[in-house]
């Protein structure tokens, strides 16, 4: 394996020799930084080699055929996929929508392509200062509005955070400075408080439990994530309780629940703020126990409790599984489940919608903030913020949507236009005799999926009525 990596390094070094980047550094530094990042993800040999060589066909006189001859079809295929992703630039609506479609096709074919692109983009963002302002703005906005949400949908929390924080100063420079200014003092204050809480909980677990403790740490909220939360909290930092969240990492699942019990023994939990994402993982695979308590001095304090494996998966998402032995059919099944949303994106464009509508669909249904609601059986449903019971019903199945007569949210009757919140338990009341949706539902539905299914019903009805008319006459 190392011999192949050395061979790839030699090819990259020779091909890029004498080339410089806009930042003034040797060009070779970029594929090296990309490869270091991929190694952090614990990815396979083909992906590591593709990372080293990903710019060779585009930036040098070496061809993809030469790479395939020396390193095989798999490596060449990955590099070709990365090259396609590199061509996604805003050049008018039609070309942009088509390029996005190509990107989703490439990712659906082999998700490792986007892992390489993430690593490549993170290093490019770190050297963005050397580019003209127009390019800075385009690359940063693309990273913030396309790549970061894709990382989020793949459960790659660490990568999403890096992409967002590196893009933030270029896309919203004034807001970035403001967030930096107001948060600096608060982070320092919060760190002292967090250190105090860590001492208390560590003492409790060491003296009064047999929990196999791996790590307790305070994790500061990333700047862009903080900015997004401030927008929802009237820009009042006093309303942000998870400026520094406490993370407890343990060996086993049983330990997670034990730790939760000890936290609640020390401090009273805040009602409605205990979330069990171990028993009910988020659709992107995220698992942890979350609890919010009235901590020392009555200060609201948030905890995340997880195993080492859950922690790795929460940071690297779907990429974490490349480091496990469960490759084969299990991994293929997992990948298919995690990429279901991407197949929906491709189907949306195949419905011959206009480029403008397709891009609106992306922003509304897929790249918007997400909420996680539950069916009465405990299944987690992933919807965009602002979604209603109508959206929920059509997400389950077209028949559930068409026969929907009402909704119960957390055991209370609610209107069909009620905006759902994360953690809601939603039950759809079915009327088997109902003929279909009401036209007014098009104004209630927030997702393109629900709207398209409602329109499809009316289009079918219209065709049937025409057919009946001609049959009568």
PLM features per residue range, with description:
Residues 64, 72-75, 81-244, 256-261, ...:
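Internal insertion modules embedded within essential enzymes
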Residues 249-251:
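Short hydrophobic/aromatic beta-strand micro-patches
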Residues 40, 69, 206-207, 265:
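Secondary-structure boundary motif
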Residues 1-114:
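Metal-dependent phosphohydrolase cores
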């Amino acid at each position: 394996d190392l011999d192949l990596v050395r061979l790839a390094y030699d090819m990259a070094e020779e091909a890029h020799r004498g080339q410089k980047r806009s930042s003034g550094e040797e060009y070779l530094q970029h594929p090296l930084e990309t490869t270091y990042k991929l190694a952090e993800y614990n990815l396979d040999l083909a992906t590591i080699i593709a990372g080293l060589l990903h710019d060779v066909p585009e930036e040098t006189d070496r061809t993809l055929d030469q790479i395939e001859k020396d390193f095989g079809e798999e490596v060449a295929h990955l590099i070709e996929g990365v090259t396609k992703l590199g061509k996604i630039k805003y050049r008018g609506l039609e070309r942009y929508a088509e390029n996005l479609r190509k990107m989703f096709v490439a990712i659906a074919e082999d998700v490792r392509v986007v892992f390489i692109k993430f690593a490549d983009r993170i290093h490019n963002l770190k050297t963005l200062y050397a580019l003209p302002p127009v390019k800075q703005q385009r690359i940063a906005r693309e990273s913030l509005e396309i790549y970061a949400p894709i990382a989020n949908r793949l459960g790659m929390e660490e990568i999403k955070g890096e992409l967002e924080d590196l893009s933030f100063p270029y896309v919203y420079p004034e807001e970035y400075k403001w967030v930096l200014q107001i948060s600096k003092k608060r982070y320092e204050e919060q760190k002292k408080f967090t250190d105090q809480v860590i001492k208390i909980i560590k003492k409790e677990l060491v003296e009064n439990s047999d929990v196999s403790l791996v790590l307790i740490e305070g994790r500061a909220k990333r700047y862009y994530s903080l900015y997004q939360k401030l927008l929802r909290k009237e820009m009042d930092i006093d309303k942000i309780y998870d400026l520094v969240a406490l993370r407890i990492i343990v060996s086993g699942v049983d330990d997670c629940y034990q730790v939760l019990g000890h936290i609640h023994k020390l401090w009273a939990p805040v009602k409605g703020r205990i979330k069990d994402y171990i028993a009910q993982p988020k659709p992107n695979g995220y698992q942890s126990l979350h609890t919010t308590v009235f901590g020392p001095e009555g200060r609201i304090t948030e905890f995340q409790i997880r195993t080492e494996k859950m922690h790795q998966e929460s940071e690297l998402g779907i990429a974490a599984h490349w480091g496990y032995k469960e490759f084969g059919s299990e991994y293929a099944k997992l990948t298919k489940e995690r990429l279901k949303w991407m197949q929906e994106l491709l189907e949306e464009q195949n419905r011959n919608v206009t480029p403008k509508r397709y891009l609106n669909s992306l922003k509304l249904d897929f790249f918007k903030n997400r909420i996680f609601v539950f069916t009465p059986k405990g299944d987690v449903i992933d919807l965009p913020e602002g979604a209603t019971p109508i959206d929920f019903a059509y997400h389950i199945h077209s028949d559930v949507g068409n026969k929907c007569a009402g909704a119960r949210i957390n055991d209370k009757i609610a209107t069909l236009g009620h905006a759902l919140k994360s953690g809601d338990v939603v039950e759809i009341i079915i009327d088997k005799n109902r003929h279909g949706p009401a036209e007014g539902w098009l104004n209630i539905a927030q997702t393109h999926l629900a709207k398209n299914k409602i329109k499809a019903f009316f289009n079918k009805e219209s065709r049937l009525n025409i057919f009946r008319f001609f049959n009568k006459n």
